[in-house]
């Protein structure tokens, strides 16, 4: 059965992409604090599972792009290591803020639980599960566990969460183990996308340049929503909303709020 997506949220809904990633390093506590400080109504973030089973907030499967480490008194780029191959303890050796600016030196990779605790119960959260293969059950089950745990300590506004993924199988599995939290399928060119949408797997996320008329007509017919990322321009956001898009994900939500 199709679930209303974030039913208490006003439309169009604005999300900060990986926090406020234009002002602070993406997917860090500093970036999520900006969401709170600026009064952004929603936030999108990404999760990966570590080798030791923790759910951490990071976009890439590797720590190379945003991770830094000190070696012989110098700051160097982290090696091309996958999050899934590193323990939580090993990940603590790396700095995930200084790549953005010296101001954010010392930012560590945050746990999803800690981020959700910081955001509280008033901010809407889109949790994107990052998994590009069939080993999705572990990260899906851990996501469900963390959401269950956070709702025990912050039970207000329980319909503030959304789980999304490019992986349609992960979305199907999450819907199977958790019927209370809505899901979203992020559109690329996966041949099974339309099938999963027809089966009620939530709303549709897509980039503005691939907002296909066929998908737009389908979602409207099925009373589903379409949200777009990444939109940083006011005029583009207004044009998309005019087309029927009800959610905007932006690196610069402070300019669109």
Task: Enumerate the language-model features and the residues they cover.
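Phosphate-group recognition and catalysis centered on beta-loop-alpha active-site segments
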Residues: 1-257
